[in-house]
Amino acid sequence: CILRQNQGVKSFNAELFKLYNDILNQNIYLDHKNIFPQTTFRNYVMIGIILRKKVWTEKFIKKYSSELPEDIRGDEVSLSYSKLFFSNKNYEKSLQYLSGFKGMNYLHYSDSSVLKLCTYYETDKYEEAYFEMDKFRHYIRNHNEIPKIHKEYALNFLKIYKMLINIKTGVDGTDLFQIENSMKKIKLKSSLMVLNLLEH
């Protein structure tokens, strides 16, 4: 199921959402250590947001976040709410959940940086956007523990994001059609954040 969803089969999302609910209702979501796996939790939050199940997503975070590993719980909850508020176009609230956020691992740091960048784009905070781009780029290059595929995705995201910012500020004459072609060439997976920006 995860493989098919990650390949971008949009029609499969409803089926995946139903499966997730079945797993929750049957109480078979915990791993062998009796905790809610971080990656699984993130998948549940994202499918809820993608399908615009806002109430369901908020209830899910409140009910199940206490079963996340203690060392990443706070960061994961903040990111989850930040993503949810971003999807609701409540950008200031989304940023509030990232205030003082450090990110104890590369997944959390990357998520928070992408959320900040997308929020800065939506709220026309271009100075903050350029600063965050530079900070994120340095983080990627200076952390060898980040898998190569994740580094490539993050750098490609920054490439597309910079093109979007340059268009919005009038720095670049590139249009959205050219950006979409660039996304195909570098095989950038469609994400909630990038698609949200392209729709404007």
Regions found by a protein language model. Name each.
Residues 77, 81-150:
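C-terminal structural cap/anchor segments
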Residues 1-35:
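Alpha-solenoid helical-repeat scaffolds
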Residues 12, 16, 30-37, 74, ...:
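Residues that mark the junctions of alpha-helical repeat units in TPR/alpha-solenoid scaffolds
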Residues 21-35, 62-72, 99-108, 135-146, ...:
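Solenoid-like repeat scaffolds
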Residues 1-2, 32-42, 70-79, 107-113:
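Generic helix N-cap/helix-start motif at coil->alpha-helix transitions
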Residues 8-22, 48-60, 86-95:
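Helix-turn-helix repeat elements of alpha-solenoid scaffolds
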Residues 2-7, 43-50, 80-85, 119, ...:
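Residue-level signature for tetratricopeptide repeat
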Residues 130-200:
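C-terminal non-catalytic interaction modules
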